[in-house]
Regions:
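Core catalytic alpha/beta fold that binds nucleotide/phospho-ligands
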Residues: 1-125
Length: 125
């Protein structure tokens, strides 16, 4: 059963501007170290950072909380299977929310171009 759906879109240039202005501090605020390493393993990391930003926003919307006190940036980690399929690992408050809602998984889909990144998240029992 579907418990929630969230979607987000962001301009890659906004993420690039934040990376340029705040550097590592911005990245460490929104991403796990594994996510930073993955994004920066690509020649142009900004679209990959933007996709993870959008994925976390979409996931928080699927929970109905948004990013804030109930669910923070580091409570969600976007990972990839060997096939390339993305998935979300919930930590801390995210894991607690999953248990409180009797949710067993969050499905996500990511897409990005040079200009935009978007994500769709579905919270299921």
């Amino acid at each position: 059963m579907i418990l929630g759906v969230g979607i987000d879109i962001i301009e890659v240039t906004r993420v690039q501007a934040s990376c340029d202005r705040f550097g590592e501090r911005f990245l460490q605020r929104i991403l796990h170290p594994n996510e930073i390493a993955y994004c920066y393993s690509h020649k142009t990391p900004a679209p990959f950072v933007a996709a993870r930003f959008a994925a976390k926003e979409a996931t928080s919307k699927a929970f109905g909380t948004g990013i804030g006190a109930a669910l923070g940036w580091h409570d969600m980690e976007v990972c990839r299977k060997e096939s390339g399929e993305p998935y979300v690992v919930m930590h801390g408050k995210g894991k607690e929310l999953m248990e409180m809602r009797n949710a067993r998984m969050t499905l996500i889909s990511l897409s990005h171009t040079q200009n935009y990144a978007n994500a769709l998240a579905v919270l299921e029992t």
